[in-house]
């Protein structure tokens, strides 16, 4: 089956993060699973500004190294990159994120077969106030929205990709570790109709 998706229907997730930053005051923005930091650089150059601090957690040492090199070219960007493993989430105590932090992930948990039960609790504890926006494909874990959801589930099972994001998120909310603020099972119409993005917005207690 072929579905042609016009480019103009594509929703830019980074603009979504920039908008979120404009609705509240934050000391820093943190991306977990940042690769070489391209999303953080886009945020900086498209409205994030110089007063915000930028942090990127990445599993690969090459990604962390490249992000640091790129950040060193921009003297006005206060950026710091560090190792982060979704399977064993922890943060160095020397990392100072400030008092109010916006965290986000974007299709980085999708290939982690199972995140641990404490993932949300650990992330929520990095600052006095944490809001997190997860842009991950988890809608099919909650509800069958049609043929795409069915194929989506089959694809993830075949590849050994994540199947427990939604259940772990619900448990964290039920346990009082976090407060879920909003969620969308499918986020508009991306250019990849067979791997649609879902969005979860939650904050620390």
Predicted regions and their residues:
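A short SAM/SAH-binding and catalytic strip from SAM-dependent methyltransferases
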Residues: 101-115
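Conserved glycine-rich SAM-binding loop
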Residues: 35
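Class I SAM-dependent methyltransferase core
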Residues: 31
């Amino acid at each position: 089956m072929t579905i042609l998706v016009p480019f103009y229907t594509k929703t830019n997730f980074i603009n979504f993060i920039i908008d979120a930053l404009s609705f509240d005051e934050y000391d820093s923005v943190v991306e977990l699973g940042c690769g070489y930091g391209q999303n953080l650089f886009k945020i900086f150059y498209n409205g994030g500004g110089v007063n915000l601090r930028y942090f990127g957690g990445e599993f690969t040492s090459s990604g962390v190294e490249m992000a640091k090199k790129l950040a060193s070219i921009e003297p006005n960007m206060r950026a710091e990159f560090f190792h982060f493993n979704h399977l064993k989430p922890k943060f160095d105590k020397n990392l100072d994120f400030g008092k109010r932090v916006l965290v986000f992930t974007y299709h980085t948990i999708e290939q982690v077969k199972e995140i641990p039960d404490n993932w949300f609790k650990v992330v929520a504890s990095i600052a006095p106030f944490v809001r997190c926006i997860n842009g991950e494909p988890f809608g099919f874990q909650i509800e069958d929205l049609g043929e795409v959801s069915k194929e989506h589930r089959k694809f993830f099972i075949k590849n050994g990709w994540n199947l427990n994001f939604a259940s772990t998120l619900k448990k964290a909310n039920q346990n009082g570790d976090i407060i879920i603020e909003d969620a969308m099972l499918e986020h508009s119409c991306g250019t990849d109709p067979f791997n649609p993005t879902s969005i979860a917005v939650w904050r620390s207690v």
